[in-house]
């Protein structure tokens, strides 16, 4: 946890002033995939700037709750429009990210699921399992996630409002 906290508690990572902002972090198991995505994200999402919030794989105590927290806190602070969290399975980071008010995280390992997660469910954080997805599929899925927008259809708005009501009731 020490190396992750050092990286995420500093103010050194800055977003570009143009376009939309993606915050990305990984635990030790997701670090290699995260680094590969960061290196190529401009290919699939040129209008998005990226803040790499840590998890470089050098410290086995870079745990999934820390990476989920880093992304969620950036989003809650209004410093990111969407988030990407990565661990070995994608499950741990999803559970941890969803503990934060206003975060709607889900695993998606294919473009159709990522697109539907945003359009139907207003998903704002995408999770990958590094042990379960290839880099090329991850990039295609990330592109679908970032290119999609929540639907303004009444049925989807009604459903996401119900989810928000549950979140408020449980706060």
What do these predicted regions represent?
Residues 47-60:
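A short beta-strand-loop structural module common to alpha/beta enzyme folds
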Residues 64-85:
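Short, structured active-site "lid" loops
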Residues 85-131:
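Mid-chain, well-packed structural core segment of small domains
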Residues 2-4, 20-25, 29-32, 111-171:
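C-terminal binding/interaction regions
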Residues 32-43:
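Short, solvent-exposed amphipathic alpha-helices that sit
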Residues 21-22, 80-83, 102-104:
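Short active-site oxyanion
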Residues 14-17, 75-79, 118-120:
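Solvent-exposed alpha-helices and their adjacent loops that cap or buttress functional pockets
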